[in-house]
Amino acid sequence: MKIALIGYGKMGHMIEEIALQRGHEIVCKIDVNNPQDIDSPEFCSADVAIEFTNPTAAYGNYLKAFSHNVKVVSGSTGWMKDHKEDVEKLCADGKQTLFWASNFSIGVAIFSAVNRYLAKIMNGFPQYSVCMQETPHVHKLDAPSGTAITLAEEIIDNIDRKKDWKRGVTYWTEDGHHDEGDANITDEDLVINCVRDGEGPGIHAVMYDSDADMITIEHSAHSRKGFALGAVLAAEFTANHSGLLTTSDLFKF
């Protein structure tokens, strides 16, 4: 496949390495220094663009790629609140393709399946209270992360006593300051606490606590390699699939 990269930071470099190892060609690399190249012949020749940028840039990047009929794989988060319906319409009515996921790691896809299954079980045991904690790297812009929100929404969909998620305490270990999070948290809210610590790719944990015991499931990333491989697998998936896609389309479990 001919692949364009939108965003050439640490993730972009890792995606490039894995894509080349799997026999693909990188035809264009777009970063903050050359945003105009998204209109270049090289970009337009791509079968798919893999986009990892930020919440403010992502939607505009999708529109640019779609205008050139280039499919998009994206791991950017934080844009869905304002633009989800627009993207759904573009993929349905405009026949465009976006494979979006808050996390492309195969391990997180498996963790997500376990999370959904456990939530269905715990729906019948109201003596257990559920909460979440995530520990991404200190540079992560959104708190909670898109991955944490996706996991929380899966729990809410399967546990009747939870109606919404709320941001709990966010703590930065580097300088010790913290943010108390959302006000007016009730028993119907699933609290997501965040710890910003170091340079690690991320830890996500779901805890079910009762007077008798605690059940915890956790995913810990050792590197960005798992995310990058998943993004390339998603790009390969778009060769024969179109529309609005996500990891549940790619991983059938």
Name what the model sees in each region.
Residues 2, 10-43, 124-253:
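C-terminal substrate-binding/catalytic lobe of Rossmann-fold NAD(P)-dependent oxidoreductases
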Residues 26, 72-73, 97-98:
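Hydrophobic beta-strand scaffold residues
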Residues 41-42, 46, 52-75, 85-86:
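Rossmann-fold NAD(P) dinucleotide-binding segment
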Residues 76-98, 109, 114-117:
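Rossmann-fold NAD(P)-binding glycine/threonine-rich loop
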Residues 86-105, 122-132:
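Rossmann-fold dehydrogenase core element
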